């Protein structure tokens, strides 16, 4: 049922985003009338969530963040909640099977997948896990200094335009970029009757958003977006998209020359203290690997450990509940839970123990709640109604 719901909801949203169809209804809704103060008594008693994008980790730690649960309001969509809590659309959709993504409804419990198992990759520069649709940034540090990691959701290339795996680097930064659609992209759009211009100037119609980092891979970029609901989806032509508020911070902190490592790891194991956690994501549609027996695949890594993570897993292989891994792989919800050593916890117990938080922008979040990323910039100021009327009637 999880996979069916995901496959039904995502293509509808993706089609609108890829085809550049206006998507105002999802993100910019008419503000509902204010409710009587008495109607909002219960929720403010819940604690405000802490932002889950920046962490300090030890070399032995592989899991950051914490699973949380909130309650939706009548006007919410899952896309609203995803941006509010800095997760991607697919992440929140998979974590909440059976919840209507467009109308979750007043009082519906919403699982916030804000606990993350780090990819098994060198903790250096930018690390992207395509299957999880997440980026991790490890800033340079002095020897002996704590390890910092910053993580955000990303959108990646759609089927047929996959984001490549491997290693590259950031070679330049561009603020308010001009978009020059490649010939291949213009041809694809033309087949659907959508004629793209040769260039798109900076501004609200530019799909690159306000910040762009070029990679050494030709034609591949890390950039913002003018359609935030597409973050956490496969809707690009291979580039990596972030929420405007996230790319603006990475743009300022990631220097040219930063290493970029792209991996594709749908099934993640990681240590938090002396407990091993599993986090499963559905493999990408064009992932050609055989995942019919996930525990077997993972245990092969333990038999030939190449990293400290797998060496430690190999030492505790007999104490790990591999049957629980099989169950998690069969219904991938992106929720991490322990599988040993010792008594593990199933998904239901993990959800029951998750803290309940207020449905509001978390403390320390990257987003301030302003949907228009161009607001306050006179360069992109919108004309007032009088000016618009005058322009439309002029010869």
What is each stretch, according to the model?
Residues 23, 73-103, 146-148:
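LysM (lysin motif) carbohydrate-binding repeats in extracellular/periplasmic proteins that recognize
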